[in-house]
Design a protein with these regions (language model features):
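Short S/T/G/P-rich N-terminal loop/turn motif that feeds into the first structured element of a domain
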Residues: 1-57, 64-74, 97-104
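A generic structural signal for ordered secondary structure
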Residues: 60-63, 85
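C-terminal structural segments of small proteins and small subunits
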Residues: 70, 78-94
């Protein structure tokens, strides 16, 4: 029997309208991200949209469990950080479970 640890992710698509205020959010979100075991996989680096639409910044965080990912988003610490983001950007955020099925 194969035991696999399927990871869980936040995928955030963000358009930043106020970079200085967004930096305050990026500083504030470190507290809940650390508390819930988040690890940045992408954080607004180089990208090229090859099909469809995305916002200008894509952030992917990995969490140790789906429950941890949701708990982080719903935490009072993240709620405080989110208030800083809301005035500085528009974001679409999804919590996703990794895939452990058959691969090509």
């Amino acid at each position: 029997m194969r035991v696999v640890d399927v990871q869980r992710y936040w995928v955030a698509n963000v358009d930043i309208s106020n970079p200085d205020e967004y930096k305050k959010y990026a500083t504030a979100n470190a507290v809940p991200f650390r508390k819930y075991g988040a690890k940045f996989l992408t954080r607004g680096g180089k990208s090229e949209m090859v099909e469809g639409k995305l916002r200008s910044r894509v952030v992917v965080l990995e969490f140790p469990s789906f429950e941890a990912a949701l708990a982080c988003y719903r935490s009072p610490e993240y709620a405080a950080a989110k208030k800083l983001r809301e005035g500085a950007s528009v974001a679409d955020i999804a919590v996703l479970e990794g895939y452990d099925g058959q691969q090509p």
